[in-house]
């Protein structure tokens, strides 16, 4: 029986799942907005939010913890230099998941995952 076993499997091996969420978290920290399926977005919260909490206190030990989970120097750097200070006073809830309809090929529910309070760049209108 599968009672009290949390987390989705996504029909992948544990190594594939771990690599997928590592890559998704790194992309989220770099771009601050990604589009993925709704179940993956919900599961990504469990990976990314604790990393941002680690990023709030800069130090060698915390940087090594973050690097062990992300394996991406650029993402870890941004996590501690930019994202950690941005969320220093926020007690959790760093991500927002917005539903984005259904994918054309397989009708999978899609969602945008974005960092709360990210700076929105205004696009210039060509006249």
From Swiss-Prot:
Key words of the record: Ribonucleoprotein, Ribosomal protein
Q: Which GO terms describe its biological process?
A: translation
Q: Which superkingdom heads the taxonomic lineage of this protein's source?
A: Bacteria
Presence of keyword Ribosomal protein: yes
List, alphabetically, the InterPro entries matched: Ribosomal_bL17, Ribosomal_bL17_CS, Ribosomal_bL17_sf
Give GO terms: molecular function aspect only. Answer: structural constituent of ribosome
Q: Name one GO cellular component term.
A: cytosolic large ribosomal subunit
Q: Does the keyword Lipoprotein apply?
A: no
- Xref: NCBIfam families: L17
Family per record: Belongs to the bacterial ribosomal protein bL17 family.
- Quaternary assembly: Part of the 50S ribosomal subunit. Contacts protein L32.
What is the protein name given in its UniProt record?
Large ribosomal subunit protein bL17
Upper lineage? Bacteria, Pseudomonadati, Pseudomonadota, Gammaproteobacteria, Lysobacterales
């Amino acid at each position: 029986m599968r009672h009290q076993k949390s987390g989705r499997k996504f029909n992948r091996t544990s190594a594939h799942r771990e690599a997928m969420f590592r890559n998704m978290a790194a992309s989220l920290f770099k771009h601050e907005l990604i589009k993925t399926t709704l179940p993956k977005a919900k599961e990504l919260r469990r990976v990314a939010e604790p990393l941002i909490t680690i990023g709030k206190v800069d130090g060698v030990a915390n940087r090594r913890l973050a690097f062990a989970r992300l394996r991406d120097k650029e993402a870890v750097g941004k996590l501690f230099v930019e994202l950690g200070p941005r969320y220093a006073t926020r007690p959790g809830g760093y991500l927002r998941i917005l539903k984005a309809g259904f994918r054309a090929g397989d009708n999978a529910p899609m969602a945008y995952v974005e960092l709360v309070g990210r700076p929105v760049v205004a696009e210039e209108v060509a006249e």
